[in-house]
Amino acid sequence: MISPYYQEENITIYNGDCLEVMKELPDKSIDLVLTDPPYGVDLKYSDYVDTESNWFDLFESIIPEFKRIADVSILPSCQIKRLEYIYKTFPPDWLICWYKGSAGTSGFLGFNDWEPLLVYGKKKIYMHDYLAINNNEKMGSYGHPCPKPIGWAKWFISRVTNEGDTILDPFLGSGTTARACKDLGRKCIGIEISQKYCDIAVKRLGQEVFNFAEVNQ
């Protein structure tokens, strides 16, 4: 396996191709894959061509690996129109509706206010099939064109895993999943092809989090 780009207690970040790194991970060594792959809608990335055709190739490559290495995998389907294709190729075990509220991007009849999330794995987990968390991270937050809110990551991590479990984010981006794992006492393996975003993720990990609960005790 390639050497880690960054490592601290419970957090390891690799700068490289996620498919190459995941091939080195043992079967069922990950408790949860929580990630947000490229959307295939021509977003501007410096290290990846975000075309729709590349999205199909990527999806068909990553899902078998997720199912091999992880107990549970959760990821956005990105485009509602792709659900028919997804159910024909790699049908999920569960589908969750993420309602973004007024922060969702406006679209035809407001359909972009919600996004389907794919769940692979049959581990017994306690979640509803409906998630309401505002997408309050602005486009360009932390230098990334499409960040997920940290509350989104923490919601899944806290419900699907226990303290000390290992979470994998093979499209780490600006490091939201890694930061959430650090806050919640989980181990995290992050993979990111862009060195720029690896550096941003490392910087986020070094930020102190103000604990209001401790102050109010």
Where in this protein do the model-derived segments appear?
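Core catalytic lobe of class I
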Residues: 2-199
